[in-house]
Amino acid sequence: MPDQSPILLWLRRDLRLADHPALHAACATGRPVIPVFIRDGAVDDLGAAPKWRLGLGLAHFAQSLAGLGSQLVLRQGPADRVLADLIAETGASAIYWSRLYDPQAQARDRAVKDWARGQGYEARSFGGHLMFEPWTVATKTGGEYKVYTPFWRAVRGREVDQPLPAPARIPAPQTWPQSDALETWQLGRAMQRGADVVAPYVRLGEAAALARLAEFVDGPIARYDALRDIPAAPGTSGLSENLALGEISPHQCWHAALAALHQGVASAETFMKELVWREFAYHLMFHTPRLLSQNWKAEWDNFPWNSDASTPQVQAWLQGRTGVEFVDAAMREMYVTGRMHNRARMIVASYLCKHLLSHWQ
């Protein structure tokens, strides 16, 4: 008799149905799949806006799961403890998840995998958040890349996996485990009135992200190389929030751009290069995790930075009241729309660090 013990699908930054390798593999077994999202310390450490946006994404993804006869189980606590509880409650014998790459997530996931396998359970991690796993791209001497252009040259000719289709259905367990009600988590509480301001600009969920990608490839990508650095022009994809939560995959974006490139849209390659900048950032973080807490160049460690965020100058920067029109407009853009144009981010950060001499931390 085939194994019918459930598989726990541990969700994090992969709130989509299509091109979801972990979900695809779980459904392919024919066994019941229990999608679960855990509110642990990594979630609680998020700022007000990301936490609010996560809440919106979870609510929307729960509806998507319901459309395929599934549910989203919500639990709170340390991931290893919550997963152990769910295994005990459901009789699950496997945990599948999509890999993350920051040091905290790596340590957590490694501990979960070691514990699960030590108990005789199946524990499998899958790609999907990146096109090129950080350990698969190396210099000729076997080291990591530290400069973007050689990194781009190393990956530009590689085959990128074709996006996987969404499952037609998700096998459900006979009995669902207890779940928290999302509203009790109050993920948007700290946003207060800001939620009403930003909400109209949110591109929420997988369907909206895919629609925007199609719209972008059908139009703006043709002038992406010329318009992407002009903050006043609608020349970017606007998909950062969806990529961050995994409501769309980089593979989907890559292949849409590649199709445009094959149709003669030369500037599509510029967009593909920007997708690889994202890959490069993860590559650096994975191989040099100290970047999250230390200067890239040690010679800046003894620079007399201003580390007091309460100074009038820094507060004016935060509030968009520096008197420098571009900087202030960029900050207001972020507060109103939840986004800031890439070129504006560079200028705003430069003003803070190079003009006000404030430490980036």
What does each of the following model-derived ranges do?
Residues 121, 142-300:
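Glycine/tryptophan-enriched, flexible segments
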Residues 118, 260-264, 337-340, 358-359:
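Secondary-structure transition/capping motifs at alpha-helix termini
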Residues 292, 298-303, 346-361:
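Active/binding-pocket-proximal capping segment
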Residues 22, 212, 238-239, 253-256, ...:
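Short, hydrophobic/aromatic alpha-helical segments in well-folded domains
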Residues 13-15, 101, 127-130, 152, ...:
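Short, flexible loop/turn elements at secondary-structure junctions
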Residues 282, 287, 313-358:
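C-terminal substrate/ligand-recognition segments
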Residues 1-163, 267, 332-333:
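Trp/Phe/Arg-rich N-terminal binding region typifying the photolyase-homology
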Residues 290-323:
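Helix-loop-helix junctions that connect adjacent transmembrane helices in secondary transporters/permeases
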